[in-house]
Amino acid sequence: MTEEVNPKAFPLADAQLTAKIMNLLQQALNYNQLRKGANEATKTLNRGLADIVVLAGDAEPIEILLHLPLLCEDKNVPYVFVRSKQALGRACGVSRPIVACSVTTNEGSQLKSQITSIQQEIERLLV
């Protein structure tokens, strides 16, 4: 029943980066800096609020979220794919699978250093 990661899902986070991202998502949820779902992620990007966009590589069909990488590149926001939509949903504090989410900007947030370090790691994946 496990769905394979689509080859269009690039850049794909490795296990270590995925763990850091999931940890950040759980903390962002506590600080009210997490928007869940492809539509919410699109809204935060359009409003210029998104810091990082996380996408599920096993979304079916993958085309439902392939507009997000284009929008991220347009707005200069780092994005990354993780392997499992189920794990993404759990990290976001929801019992259902989630195909996309975004961590939003907040001035004076304690998460700023963590967000910056993950942004740099995502940018290293693209090189």
UniProtKB/Swiss-Prot annotation:
Which InterPro entries does the entry link to? Answer: eL8/uL1-like (IPR050257), H/ACA_rnp_Nhp2-like (IPR002415), Ribosomal_eL30-like_sf (IPR029064), Ribosomal_eL8-like_CS (IPR004037), Ribosomal_eL8/eL30/eS12/Gad45 (IPR004038), Ribosomal_eL8/Nhp2 (IPR018492)
One annotated Gene Ontology cellular component of this protein: small nuclear ribonucleoprotein complex
Q: What is its main location?
A: nucleus
Instruction: Report if keyword Lyase is assigned.
Output: no
Q: Which CDD domains match?
A: SNU13
Compartment list: Nucleus, Nucleolus
Tell me the function of this protein.
Binds to the 5'-stem-loop of U4 snRNA and may play a role in the late stage of spliceosome assembly. The protein undergoes a conformational change upon RNA-binding.
Q: What is this protein called?
A: NHP2-like protein 1 homolog
* Provenance organism: Drosophila melanogaster (Fruit fly)
- Quote the gene name from the UniProt entry: hoip
